[in-house]
Amino acid sequence: MTSGSVDLLVVNDGAALRGYDCRDVVRVEEAAGEPGGYLVRLGRLGSPREVACREVLGSVALSAREIRPVPEVLRERITGEKPWAVGLTGQGMYLLY
């Protein structure tokens, strides 16, 4: 992580582009029995968990001005894992987990 920015691992889960703090990533591996699928193991910064995705797109550094918190009203409507913020860049929008 550089000063004033967050380095994110960007993945495509088939529905959205998701970003995970690179410091939290333990390992990325191909999912067994899932051609073209990947399993991202997280847990360096919190509780261990696994995230399945279709593809790993790489990493991106977002500055503080490119990150916006997700309003609580919207977070309540989202089922499953809830993003804490949205990253907005010239390349696209990322849900941050």
Describe the role of every protein-language-model region:
Residues M1-Y97:
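An acidic, low-aromatic, low-complexity terminal/linker signal
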